[in-house]
Amino acid sequence: MKPVKPPRINGRVPVLSAQEAVNYIPDEATLCVLGAGGGILEATTLITALADKYKQTQTPRNLSIISPTGLGDRADRGISPLAQEGLVKWALCGHWGQSPRISELAEQNKIIAYNYPQGVLTQTLRAAAAHQPGIISDIGIGTFVDPRQQGGKLNEVTKEDLIKLVEFDNKEYLYYKAIAPDIAFIRATTCDSEGYATFEDEVMYLDALVIAQAVHNNGGIVIMQVQKMVKKATLHPKSVRIPGYLVDIVVVDPDQTQLYGGAPVNRFISGDFTLDDSTKLSLPLNQRKLVARRALFEMRKGAVGNVGVGIADGIGLVAREEGCADDFILTVETGPIGGITSQGIAFGANVNTRAILDMTSQFDFYHGGGLDVCYLSFAEVDQHGNVGVHKFNGKIMGTGGFIDISATSKKIIFCGTLTAGSLKTEITDGKLNIVQEGRVKKFIRELPEITFSGKIALERGLDVRYITERAVFTLKEDGLHLIEIAPGVDLQKDILDKMDFTPAISPELKLMDERLFIDAAMGFVLPEAAH
């Protein structure tokens, strides 16, 4: 049963309170929620109204949730307020860890739970807008979304196959089913009286248009939260990202903020202001900076790269310190191109950004092999070079864009520490000192579920490195090869004994560059790209 839309009067989009708007969501509806971490483009007022309504009335019931990007604060925001038994029965997310209350329902087998790669999920929404049954892609082959493995299912109660293995011209692909949503929660900054919307105070666009088209073309209701409204036809047409005919309900929240907390708008993050070179931004010399510095050594002039959330995200600041940040382009999967990468939950809220694409188009570029290099954080690595990030220690985190990015990037740099859990290190006198070893080994014999396939990467001719604070590995046909160790660490005690398998030791094993361990600019010169 399709939801019933409120009527327009004289072409004006209905303007309702959030409480009135969520009354249009029927039982069993499929709700698609726009937003990214830290409050980026999150329609918080709508989410809160829906959560409160269910607490009070126990309606609507049995919703299905689609969330392409990880929105939330890794605690109680994002879609975590919707984690109420009976409100949600099914979820398909690109990333889960930013809204852990929803993840907990999946971990407890209380909801049906799927994970598509983030880029694939936004592309299936575009397919749903075009009334296409799904997409066919080689992204995800050899990983847990491959139906020969887990097929993207995250728990025991999830049974239906949404992903199928298909073959064309003797090549394997995955078919990802497109799910058409009935309701959309989207957000913009401003709209006119007919619903035409602009994003001038927002950090990015994400896939707002794709979601709105998917819901509209399948007879659903698009509910849009904005900070303000203006008169009809007063917005610049080149600034409008959502045409009014896609919008069925507008909810105005004058207290809407760009991110969680803080000022309503940070003009550096919205792209209106830029930081000049006199503004000093730097990282303290610790294991995080050490990894970012070593990762920078893998960059080349003119390269186009991606940087992921986590320990890898310091590379932009390190490059700025070294004076080479303008010699390459770093992108973020949510749309930003260039600039200084943010850190923490509001990942992608960059400053000095050069351009911003919609997220779906950014992933098209990635899937087609456009990236020269990517920097991704890892949770676990096994002896075959496989990497796991989507599920570990019993917790569902989801893949985000990890699979999309690592599947085709020409060079793949995984960044992390060798161990986890209370690891403490010091960098003194040009050496690394392990003050307190981590409790958990991250290099294990076999991964239970695979987010990155070393085997597939080698078949595709990709160059794969694993950079930690004390060791650097590369991937070859026979597995991991140790190629560098940090000065001050013992090969056996601090590296090999802290792994569940023994890597091959390169005959050219050397110390990591001594400049990495000095608390001063390295004088690093970015190498030219090989031709």
Go through each PLM region and give its residues.
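Conserved phosphate- and dinucleotide-binding cores of soluble alpha/beta proteins
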Residues: K2-K5, I9-N23, G38-Y54, I66, ...
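Glycine-rich phosphate/ribose-binding loops and adjacent secondary-structure elements
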Residues: V22, R61, L281-P284, R293-R300, ...
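Short glycine-rich phosphate-binding loop at a beta-alpha junction
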Residues: L31-V33, V304-G308
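Short glycine-rich or small-residue beta-strand-to-loop segments that form or flank ligand, phosphate
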Residues: T30-G35, S64-S67
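Glycine-rich phosphate/diphosphate-binding loops and the adjacent beta-loop-alpha structural elements
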Residues: Y196, T274-Q287, R294-N306, G479-L480, ...
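Helix-to-beta-strand junctions that scaffold the AdoMet/dcAdoMet cofactor pocket
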Residues: P26
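Beta-solenoid repeat scaffold
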Residues: L50-L63, F328
